[in-house]
């Protein structure tokens, strides 16, 4: 809650949230290219924010992707600094275009990167995970039996516009009403 109050809500996608935040700070390149679709050379950019999301540039609340840095990246960086160990992260390239791009660039182990990291599950698919759990009878969190496909930050709205019904927030209301109320109602 403190991170959202300080930085803003994570909406649409990390990339869209970053563009919106930078445009609100007055970044002329982002305003020109992402809001109006004009590159610095005057040509049209195909990476313009869609008209559907342009209204968020003037939304009455803060928008940011900083929650990911605050809740995930900074703690991992601190851990690596304090212990000298490389974090092992369980993300898969199939989860997003950005993760796929990074995996194609570095593979599973990016030990030579500015912030070294190991991602041994990068090439796995979700079906591989479930096959492994069944084959080796590995216990897993029961939340996956409640209709959840992913876990993560409960406030996260990244990709929520793509959710089928019941959406993540509708499921949260049904399975964890107190947490849903904290997320949705206790701010009023």
List each language-model region with its residue ranges.
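ATP/NTP-dependent adenylation/nucleotidyl-transfer catalytic domains that generate, transfer
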Residues: 113-114, 125-188
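ATP-dependent adenylation/nucleotidyltransferase module used to activate substrates
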Residues: 1-128, 135
């Amino acid at each position: 809650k403190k991170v959202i109050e300080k930085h803003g809500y994570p909406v649409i996608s990390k990339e869209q949230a970053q563009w919106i935040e930078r445009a609100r700070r007055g970044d002329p390149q982002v305003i020109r290219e992402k809001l109006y679709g004009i590159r610095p050379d005057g040509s049209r950019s195909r990476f313009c924010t869609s008209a559907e999301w342009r209204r968020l540039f003037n939304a009455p609340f803060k928008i940011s992707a900083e929650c990911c840095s605050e809740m995930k990246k900074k703690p991992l960086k601190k851990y690596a600094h304090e212990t000298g160990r490389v974090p092992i992260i369980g993300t898969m390239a199939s989860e997003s275009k950005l993760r796929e791009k990074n995996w194609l660039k570095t593979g599973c182990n990016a030990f030579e990167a500015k912030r070294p990291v190991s991602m041994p599950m990068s090439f796995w698919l979700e079906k591989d995970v479930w096959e492994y759990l069944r084959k080796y009878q590995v216990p897993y969190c029961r939340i996956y039996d409640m209709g959840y496909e992913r876990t993560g930050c409960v406030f996260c709205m990244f990709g929520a516009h793509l959710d089928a019904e019941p959406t993540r927030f509708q499921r949260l209301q049904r399975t964890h009403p107190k947490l849903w109320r904290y997320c949705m109602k206790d701010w009023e």
